[in-house]
Structures are given as C-alpha cells and as structure tokens.
Swiss-Prot record:
Keywords: Host cytoplasm, Host-virus interaction, Inhibition of host innate immune response by virus, Inhibition of host MAVS by virus, Inhibition of host RLR pathway by virus, Viral immunoevasion, Viral RNA replication
GO cellular component: cytoplasm; host cell cytoplasm
Name used for this protein in its record: Protein M2-2
Annotated organism of origin: Human metapneumovirus (strain CAN97-83)
Family: Belongs to the metapneumovirus M2-2 protein family.
C-alpha cells in the first residue's frame, strides 16, 4: 500500500470472492486528507465502477492493493 496524503487520485486492486481481481481508478474533486476519507472514496469508487453488478457487495470485497497520490 502506497499512500501520499493528501491525495486526489486513488488506484486500487480489489477482489470479489466469486470473481478475479479488478483494477479501479478513482479521481476525486476535493482532497482526501485522512484514511477515513480514503475508505469512503474507495467505497464510492467500487459502487460507481459497477463491480457490484457481479454480486460483489462491499462486505465481500477484499482490497489487495491501494496507491493514493496527488496528481
């Protein structure tokens, strides 16, 4: 996990128990300053990436890798 706080871009490799790994990129308008805000951005990004179409609900998703940076 590589975190540069504050950040505006987050890349994550996630895995649902039923499917293989999915790579998502999240770009936010406002800076992410805390790990709590980072978790919220990841949750929103997972939902917006339509990963949940494949029955991957947040409680079933494993976050394998996260990279957060400013640009």
């Amino acid at each position: 996990m590589t975190l540069h706080m504050p950040c505006k871009t987050v890349k994550a490799l996630i895995k649902c128990s039923e499917h293989g790994p999915v790579f998502i990129t999240i770009e936010v308008d406002e800076m992410i300053w805390t790990q709590k805000e980072l978790k919220e951005a990841l949750s929103d990004g997972i939902v917006k990436s339509h990963t949940n179409i494949y029955n991957c609900y947040l409680e079933n998703i494993e976050i394998i890798y996260v990279k957060a940076y400013l640009s």
